[in-house]
Amino acid sequence: MRIDPFKLAHWMNARKYTAAQTADLAGLPLDDLRRLLGDEANEPDPAAATALAEALSVEPSQLAADAHRNLTVVHKSAEEMHASRRPIQRDGIHFYNYYTLAAPEGRVAPVVLDILCPSDRLPALNNGHLEPAITVNLGPGDINGRWGEEITPQTWRVLHANHGGDRWITGDSYVEPSYCPHSYSLAGDAPARIVSYTAQSNISPLMTEANNWSTGAFEEALKALSGKVSAGSVLDLFLARRAHTRTSAAEAAGVPPADLEAALRSPASETGLTVLRTLGRALGFDYRVLLPADDQHDGVGKTWTTIEDSRRSRRTFGTYEAASMASAAHLPDLVGSFLRVDADGRGADLIDHAENHYVVTEGRLTLEWDGPDGPASVELEPDGSAWTGPFVRHRWHGTGTVLKFGSGAHLGYQDWLELTNTFEPAATLRRGRRDLAGWGYDN
């Protein structure tokens, strides 16, 4: 296992150990530790790596080097995508074929599905998954979607394919929440496919943490979150952690208790915002967490965008023509666009604050990007795909269509909230990136 020198330095600082103390605790020569701090390619024997982890009270994996450093773009040809095909059996029939699109190893990747369940059969539901998703009909046929045991207008709907002259907008799309059971069948005799953009879930770290909690602790958490998370329930948790009641908190903030109760009933009102902001300043918490989400979903959690909705969203973006897929304010990191490319020369630069996943649906397109060793490019045809990292400058040219998806896997809205609270954010990031500075007491 290669040791990441920056992770090693971070944990030495976090544990408040000097290099000499760390080496002594791990039973390593000090010069060996210094070599690990200075050389990313240095790979200690397993016993030394384990000893270092034990000395710093961490798991060895918390010191392991990542394989993704300096990664800018990952791409996959149509042939490579087709080679990833795996047939799925469900309900006694060949139900789907799955194909994986480009993504770095160890990260969530979008998939394309051949829909094979015939139209005269009710498609058997799956169990849902943690990752929310944007699902888009790629055509050429329509698709039946199912989202519940009982068939209702909310649990059964057709995802239409675009049969018009603007087929670069491939079809209907919808946003699907975590753990929503779903399934699809053909809506006629025409074949059909979907792309399922399963994005990284922002609550995935919480679920990983909760897996290690005791059953009693987890049940207490569920009590606090029962029903719809509200300003009052969250505030009560914040106050208990600070040894406050609503009465004492209101007194500390100079707010009448009745005004606080009114603010919790209507947190987004002008008075509610003023009261909660005053309370946050007095007690030291971010009042924005208490504001209600702007939910945009039906009774099973879906948010739908029809072909006509996408057509109405058409606009020029640099050298591209764009149209929107389904989106929802309560899942702000989950984004998707249809992108029409028609540029013989260099296309307009694209540079996003989070990862992008692309899949080509028509034409032969060239993706160019600024790599760590200079300009790079790849030519992709339909079913070719690519992943671009955050803040990687890239562009498309040629004539065709590419579907553009994004998630919050890198710099998501939670990160932006944190950065708005960070003193000198640029300086903090500059210092923290690849930081090998000791904590100041080695000498």
UniProtKB/Swiss-Prot annotation:
**What catalytic reaction does the record list?**
2-hydroxyethylphosphonate + O2 = hydroxymethylphosphonate + formate + H(+)
- What InterPro entries does the database record attribute to this sequence? Cro/C1-type_HTH (IPR001387), Lambda_DNA-bd_dom_sf (IPR010982), RmlC-like_jellyroll (IPR014710), RmlC_Cupin_sf (IPR011051)
- What EC number(s) are associated with this protein in UniProt? 1.13.11.72
Protein residues bound to substrate: 16, 98, 126, 176, 182, 196
Q: Which residues does Fe cation bind?
A: 129, 182
Write down the required cofactor(s).
Answer: Fe(2+)
The pathway entry for this protein reads as: Secondary metabolite biosynthesis; bialaphos biosynthesis
Q: Which UniProt keywords apply?
A: Antibiotic biosynthesis, Dioxygenase, DNA-binding, Iron, Metal-binding, Oxidoreductase, Repeat
Task: Give the first-level EC class, as a single word.
Answer: oxidoreductase
- GO terms classed as biological process: antibiotic biosynthetic process; organic phosphonate biosynthetic process; phosphinothricin biosynthetic process
> Is Isomerase tagged as a keyword?
no
The record's comment on cofactor binding reads:
Binds 1 Fe(2+) ion per subunit.
Q: Which GO terms describe its molecular function?
A: DNA binding; ferrous iron binding; identical protein binding; oxidoreductase activity, acting on single donors with incorporation of molecular oxygen, incorporation of two atoms of oxygen; protein homodimerization activity
Residues forming the HTH cro/C1-type domain are: 8-63, 234-290
Listed SUPFAM superfamilies: RmlC-like cupins
Q: Which residues bind DNA?
A: 19-38, 245-265
What is said about its interaction partners and assembly?
A: Homodimer.
User: Which family does the entry's similarity section mention?
Assistant: Belongs to the non-heme iron-dependent dioxygenase family.
Described by its record, this protein's role is as follows: Non-heme-dependent dioxygenase that catalyzes the conversion of 2-hydroxyethylphosphonate (HEP) to hydroxymethylphosphonate (HMP) in the biosynthesis of phosphinothricin tripeptide (PTT), also known as bialaphos (BA), a natural-product antibiotic and potent herbicide. PTT contains the unusual amino acid phosphinothricin attached to 2 alanine residues. Synthetic phosphinothricin (glufosinate) is a key component of commercial herbicides.
- Please, what other remarks does the record include? Mediates the cleavage of the carbon-carbon bond of 2-hydroxyethylphosphonate (HEP) to produce hydroxymethylphosphonate (HMP) and formate without input of electrons or use of any organic cofactors. Reaction was initially supposed to follow a Criegee rearrangement with a phosphorus-based migrating group. However, it was laster shown that it is not the case.
Q: What is this protein called?
A: 2-hydroxyethylphosphonate dioxygenase
Species in which this protein is naturally found = Streptomyces viridochromogenes (strain DSM 40736 / JCM 4977 / BCRC 1201 / Tue 494)
Protein's gene: hepD
